[in-house]
């Protein structure tokens, strides 16, 4: 089944913008970047010229020889056998991180040929630029990032009627109980499946969890193969060590990343490069601790205290080797993992809505709040509870210490607001930006 992705509407808006620049679509491997650009091209253009620098290396030489858009257009026409016209052709440059000269040419398309619709995709673009020191056309391109399929996108694909009910939830009031339970069940299935498009599509078509798991395993394997292909030989073992240890770090109660758990006696300077590579590749999200929750949060982060979450909760479940029915049924055997699974799920949504700079707060052994968000000039603490047990004291301690205008608790309970505390069901986290803006 083809999954409708929200990124298509954003691409359509880019097309209609009279001040558009060449577009770079970023994102981890296997999240659907190439598919999205081709889908956009089919819906909005008469024709597509598709260039993949990984499979068409001969074009690299053409981009090395000239940066003149007219000459490059002619070379692409000859290579593909298709005419390129500004109003009706979408030019897709895929795996652009493989050709630094093509990246640099975007500046000239912006300045000298803005009438052409040029879009690019690169899974390891940040890694490639960091490794090679290549120049980048700063200010001459537009950026978008594609993430794994969100819960809302997943819901739209599996149950159109339930999705319509979900879309109508736009005020702070209790959700009808039957809808609340159905959405909670859908959330649990999303925890298992995650958002890698191929796995989601396969499950929707077959309802076979084993097939979806096999696809997830294949994606994890492809990530590992990328390590060997794109990392300097001396750094490969450390990236493998960090990647292989992530689930163990997250399984601990505090989830704080400890270098010594990767290898006994390990130091930060030995593994910081490996962590940076995984972050640049979009495979992990780094969440830093705060010295104190003050604006701007970035000025108060602790660089030496952080957690690393995966880019997809379904892949995290595979790294834990969790049994599907254990997750769906909420079995007691799942207790020690459901907290981190819920946190990973929430973080993915926060990154999509608010960007990649996320933080958490702790007061040592007294209390810990899973996420602290900066939005609309406010600091919003977010507590994540994987079930209906919301009696923990951490958020209460934070509220007493800092008196935030608004606090959010995410759990499997229904929606309600108690003074400055907004209780949201976990299935509504994709609407976080909407609800925090109206929760005053």
How should each PLM-predicted stretch be described?
Residues 25:
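Hydrophobic anchor at the beta1->P-loop junction of P-loop NTPases
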Residues 129-251:
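Interdomain motor-coupling "hinge/lid" segment immediately C-terminal to the ATP-binding subdomain
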Residues 36, 40:
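Hydrophobic positions on the alpha1 helix immediately C-terminal to the Walker A/P-loop
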Residues 33:
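Conserved lysine of the Walker
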Residues 201-373:
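Accessory nucleic acid-recognition modules appended to NTPase machines
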Residues 1-14:
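N-terminal pre-Walker A segment at the start of P-loop NTPase domains
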Residues 55-87:
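Short glycine-rich substrate-engagement loop in P-loop NTPases that contacts/grips substrate
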Residues 92, 117-123, 145:
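Structural recognition of the conserved hydrophobic beta-strand(s) that form the central parallel beta-sheet
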């Amino acid at each position: 089944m083809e999954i409708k992705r929200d990124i298509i509407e954003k691409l359509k808006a880019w097309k209609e913008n009279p001040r558009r620049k060449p577009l770079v679509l970023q994102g981890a491997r296997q999240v659907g970047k190439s598919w999205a650009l081709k889908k956009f091209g089919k819906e909005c253009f008469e024709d597509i010229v598709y260039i993949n620098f990984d499979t068409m290396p001969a074009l690299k030489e053409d981009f090395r020889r000239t940066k003149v858009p007219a000459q490059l257009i002619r070379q692409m026409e000859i290579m593909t056998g298709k005419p390129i016209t500004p109003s009706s052709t979408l030019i897709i440059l895929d795996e652009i991180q493989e050709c630094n000269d093509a990246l640099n040419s975007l500046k000239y398309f912006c300045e000298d040929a803005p009438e052409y619709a040029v879009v690019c995709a690169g899974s390891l673009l940040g890694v490639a630029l960091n490794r090679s020191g290549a120049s980048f056309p700063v200010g001459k391109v537009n950026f978008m990032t594609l993430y794994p399929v969100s819960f809302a996108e997943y819901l739209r694909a599996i149950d159109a009627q339930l999705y319509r009910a979900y879309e109508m939830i736009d005020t702070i009031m209790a959700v009808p109980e039957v809808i609340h339970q159905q959405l909670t069940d859908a959330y649990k299935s999303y925890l298992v499946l995650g958002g890698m498009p191929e796995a989601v599509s396969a499950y929707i078509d077959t309802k076979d969890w084993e097939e979806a798991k096999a696809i997830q395993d294949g994606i994890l394997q492809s990530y590992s193969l990328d390590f060997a292909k794109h990392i300097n030989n001396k750094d490969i073992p450390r990236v493998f060590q960090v990647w292989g240890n992530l689930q163990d770090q997250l399984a601990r109660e505090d989830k704080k990343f400890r270098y010594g758990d990767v290898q006994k006696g390990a130091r930060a300077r030995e593994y910081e490069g490996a962590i940076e590579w995984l972050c640049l590749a979009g495979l992990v999200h780094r969440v830093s601790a705060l010295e104190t929750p003050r604006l701007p949060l970035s000025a108060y982060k602790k660089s030496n205290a952080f957690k690393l979450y995966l880019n997809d909760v379904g892949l995290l479940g595979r790294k834990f080797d969790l049994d599907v029915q254990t997750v769906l049924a909420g079995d007691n055997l799942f207790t020690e993992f459901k907290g981190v699974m819920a946190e990973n799920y929430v973080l993915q949504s926060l990154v999509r809505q608010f960007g990649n700079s996320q933080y958490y707060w702790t007061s040592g052994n007294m209390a810990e709040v899973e996420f602290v968000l900066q939005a609309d000039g406010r600091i919003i603490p977010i507590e994540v509870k994987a079930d209906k047990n919301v009696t923990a004291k951490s958020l209460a301690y934070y509220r007493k210490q800092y008196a935030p205008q608004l606090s959010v608790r995410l759990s499997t309970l229904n929606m309600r607001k108690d003074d400055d505390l907004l209780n949201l069901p976990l299935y509504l986290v994709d609407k976080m930006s909407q609800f925090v803006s109206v929760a005053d």
